């Protein structure tokens, strides 16, 4: 978009934070609480619940309308929030603690993490953030049909999730923006606190590059929605908290070729099944199971809007119509795989492009975990299960179907994969700065050396808190 005027707008603060999601809101909260002046730059707008319309939610709340795809053999759909509050607005608010084993893997990759950010310090930051965000265990009354199926499928190995919510009613519309405004998303919690402490939020303000002079970051160049250019200057530091993909891309746009271990994402598969339970599937809150950890997988009972659940039903004509008549009985589970594959973010015509492909072992574990989940869903009380394979049985309802499912080859693009968890694998120094650039802090999961195997919301806010508190101590 061409600017309406050649004038460059200018403003300044002690700290400039790029991004208002989990990391940006946590960083802004602690920076502002210290008495520093803070400006938060957010590309999107303040969110409003989209109601029941899935297309409207995708257009208003998601980057690229939820249609971005990683370049590579697996065609993984990349789901990222693009609004004030970032992906926290359209997530389920699940706060899974960072496993110590994942932190130990970071230390194996980079021994400096042992002293750079000890696990105890990170876990204390998590406890602090859990208290601030009113993180509570999901009550049984809100666990819905998908959760009940999971508890019956994996007795003793399915647990309520810990969530940051306020009086959740189990509306089942988390992915569209909670219609009851019960989600403790960043815009309603940490960012609201930051504003009370004096932070300013500039929405509709897309960061284009970091301004660097003599090896020091001194601000951000951004484009406003009306086309005008803005220079937002930082007296002390710039915090990149735009998400692992966007933060990695901003470094490239700023003339920095970052080093690291390579980008990772956690592939997500959705498994749908027809429940025979009296509890309906249109409402509820997530439940999680660790039963699939031998495959490097986490299993979550999720609640999706009706239209989204309908998209997972197989068949055409009368067969599909019959299944749609039972849409209230369709329960969904999410499987998240911790991968070994690495990729990279590139700049493509002024936009980020993720290049990523799973390893053969990753694909095989995806299929093994999917088969185990299908078997579990049938055991839990589903009459038929829909595994979503491109070449494989569309419906699984018997032992024979399970055998055919296990025999499916682990080829690229066999599974319709999505990703909502991203990890940049980029190097930082002991002040969490980009090496060689003073005052440019990586405050989000772009700095995580590897995937962590669980949803990263809690780990991201804890990391941003620990990093920020080091800067204002």
Regions found by a protein language model. Give the residues of each.
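FAD cofactor-binding and catalytic pocket of flavoenzymes
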Residues: 91, 256-377, 410-422, 435, ...
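A glycine-rich dinucleotide-binding beta-alpha-beta segment and adjacent secondary-structure elements
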Residues: 167-174, 209-213, 382-451, 457
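Rossmann-like flavin
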Residues: 84, 88-170, 357, 361
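Extreme N-terminal leader/targeting segments of oxidoreductases
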Residues: 1-15, 33-34, 72
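Glycine-rich loop(s) and the adjacent beta-strand/alpha-helix scaffold that form part
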Residues: 30-33, 37, 44-49, 83, ...
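N-terminal FAD cofactor-binding segment of flavoenzymes
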Residues: 36, 43-101, 145-150
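N-terminal Rossmann-like FAD-binding beta1-loop-alpha1 element of flavoenzymes
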Residues: 15-40
């Amino acid at each position: 978009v061409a600017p309406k005027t050649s004038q460059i707008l200018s403003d300044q603060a002690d700290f400039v934070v790029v991004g208002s999601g989990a990391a940006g809101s946590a960083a802004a909260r602690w920076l502002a609480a210290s008495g520093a002046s803070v400006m938060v730059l957010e590309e999107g707008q303040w969110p409003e619940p989209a109601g029941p319309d899935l297309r409207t939610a995708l257009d208003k709340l998601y980057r690229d309308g939820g249609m971005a795809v990683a370049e590579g053999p697996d065609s993984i759909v990349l789901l990222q929030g693009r609004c004030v509050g970032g992906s926290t607005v359209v997530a389920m608010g699940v706060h899974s603690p960072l496993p110590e084993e994942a932190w130990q893997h970071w230390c194996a990759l980079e021994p400096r993490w042992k002293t750079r950010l000890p696990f105890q310090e990170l876990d204390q930051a998590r406890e602090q953030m859990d208290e601030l965000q009113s993180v509570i265990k999901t009550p049984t009354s809100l666990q819905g049909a998908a959760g009940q199926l999971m508890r019956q499928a994996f007795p003793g190995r399915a647990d309520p999730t810990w969530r940051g919510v306020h009086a959740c009613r189990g509306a089942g519309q988390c992915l569209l923006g909670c219609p009851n405004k019960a989600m403790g998303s960043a815009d309603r919690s940490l960012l609201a606190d930051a504003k009370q402490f004096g932070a300013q939020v500039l929405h509709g303000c897309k960061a284009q590059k970091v301004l660097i002079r003599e090896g020091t970051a001194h601000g951000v160049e951004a484009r406003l929605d009306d086309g005008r250019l803005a220079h937002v200057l930082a007296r002390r530091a710039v915090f990149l908290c735009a998400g692992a993909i966007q933060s990695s891309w901003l470094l490239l746009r700023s003339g920095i070729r970052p080093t690291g271990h390579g980008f990772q994402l956690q592939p997500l598969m959705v498994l749908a099944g027809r429940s025979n339970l009296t509890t309906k599937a249109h409402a509820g809150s997530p439940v999680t199971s660790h039963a699939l950890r031998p495959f490097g997988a986490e299993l979550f009972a999720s609640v999706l809007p009706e239209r989204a659940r309908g998209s997972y039903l197989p068949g055409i004509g009368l067969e599909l119509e019959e299944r749609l008549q039972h849409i209230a009985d369709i329960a969904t589970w999410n499987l998240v795989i911790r991968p070994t594959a690495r990729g990279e973010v590139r700049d493509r015509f002024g936009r980020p492009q993720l290049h990523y492909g799973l390893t053969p072992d990753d694909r095989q574990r995806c299929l093994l975990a999917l088969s185990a989940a299908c078997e579990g869903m049938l055991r839990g009380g589903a009459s038929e299960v829909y595994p979503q394979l491109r070449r494989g049985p569309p419906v699984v309802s018997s032992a024979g179907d399970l055998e055919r499912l296990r025999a499916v080859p682990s080829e690229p693009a066999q599974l319709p994969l999505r990703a909502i968890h991203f990890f940049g694998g980029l190097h930082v120094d002991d002040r969490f700065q980009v090496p060689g650039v003073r005052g440019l802090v990586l405050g989000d999961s772009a700095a995580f050396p590897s995937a962590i195997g669980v949803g990263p919301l809690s780990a991201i806010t804890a990391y941003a808190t620990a990093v920020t508190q080091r800067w204002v101590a």
